[in-house]
Regions:
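Short, small-residue-biased leader/transition segments that mark boundaries at the very start
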Residues: 2-4
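Extended, low-charge hydrophobic alpha-helical regions
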Residues: 17-168
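Long, non-coiled-coil amphipathic alpha-helical linker/lever segments
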Residues: 6, 11-12
């Protein structure tokens, strides 16, 4: 039990998420401990319960935040490539697809950086952790947030889409 809790806390810290609200974190872990022992999945549940903190960290109040979204086709390809094992899940995307997606990420990230903005990618909840895994070797500090981690009063504007063909 100890190592599951510690892994989830480490996962949160690795992505720059505050773990000050230990009560919420431990309550969420207790709520879901019976259904899964996968620390990546548990981390996603905890992130969703910390949506207020995540929203205030990345999305200033009374301001529209420019974000990058994922083409639904890319989300489908990522989910289709997920393989579950005893040790957890991993992606089996072929190198060509991975390269095409990374090129698109690079283009969109550069576009936002050139506008003086922090690149933030918004994904559907089920894809978030896999997209983060896919990109972390190339874009270590890329912020990836799921729709379920964003408060309803946050104003977002999509200024780019990560697609496989990169020319969208």
């Amino acid at each position: 039990q100890m190592c599951i809790r510690d892994r989830v806390l480490q996962n949160l810290l690795d992505e720059g998420i505050s773990i000050r609200d230990l009560l919420t974190i431990f309550e969420t872990l207790a709520d879901h401990a019976a259904t899964t022992r996968d620390t990546d999945v548990l981390t996603e549940y905890v992130r969703q319960s910390l949506k207020r903190a995540i929203s205030s960290k990345y999305f200033p109040a009374n301001e529209t935040t420019s974000v990058i979204t994922l083409d639904p086709k890319v989300e489908q390809e990522i989910m289709a490539s997920v393989k579950q094992t005893e040790q957890g899940a991993y992606l089996t995307l072929d190198p060509e697809t991975t390269k095409a997606i990374m090129n698109s990420v690079q283009n969109e990230v550069t576009k936002l950086e050139n506008m003086g903005k922090t690149p933030i990618v918004i994904t559907s909840p089920i894809v978030r952790m896999y997209f983060k895994k896919l990109t972390e070797d190339y874009f270590k500090d890329l912020i990836v947030v799921s729709y379920n981690e964003i408060e309803s009063n946050v104003e977002l504007q999509s200024v780019g889409i990560i697609s496989r063909d990169g020319d969208k």
